[in-house]
């Protein structure tokens, strides 16, 4: 019964060590899990193309990129807390034949503002209609709740093509 004793000893102490206020360092696997869950992507559906330890503003982060459903995701997760420092998303591009602006500016603004709970028109800081490879798109920026959201919305389909989130210091 010598094998049973070490297993018993481990059940009491480590459980409390890990639950101190729920904040602590995260490893690479935990950082990937945090990013995937935030994006609503199952690990089985993601093809991780980059996962490495990096530094952002002097802070250790895991830089994690993956593709899922034709879209690209890019996350930075703080090593010391597991906090999402930044997250980005680039959707599939529509065909170049969709060069008519069929989505109104008001509808596109509503799409963007609906993604940021509590934000209103006064939180929109940049807004313009631009063309990317002949495709019309709205580009904008929302600053709300200490966070900056930069986005691109396809002006022909209304689809969110890019969505980048960064906490402001």
Model features per residue range: what roles?
Residues 1-169:
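Long, terminal "pre-/pro-" and other extracytoplasmic accessory regions
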């Amino acid at each position: 019964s010598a094998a049973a004793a070490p297993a018993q000893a481990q059940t009491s102490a480590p459980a409390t060590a890990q639950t101190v206020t729920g904040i602590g360092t995260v490893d690479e696997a935990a950082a990937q899990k945090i990013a995937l869950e935030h994006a609503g992507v199952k690990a089985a559906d993601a093809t991780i193309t980059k996962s490495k330890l990096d530094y952002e503003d002097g802070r250790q982060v895991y830089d994690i990129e993956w593709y899922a459903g034709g879209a690209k995701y890019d996350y930075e997760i703080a090593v010391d807390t597991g906090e999402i420092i930044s997250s980005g998303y680039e959707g599939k591009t529509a065909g170049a034949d969709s060069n008519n602006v069929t989505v109104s500016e008001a509808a596109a603004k509503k799409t963007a503002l609906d993604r940021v709970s509590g934000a209103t028109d006064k939180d929109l800081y940049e807004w313009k209609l631009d063309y990317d490879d002949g495709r019309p798109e709205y580009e904008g920026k929302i600053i709300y709740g200490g966070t900056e959201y930069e986005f691109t919305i396809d002006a022909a389909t209304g689809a969110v093509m890019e969505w980048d989130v960064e906490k402001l210091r």
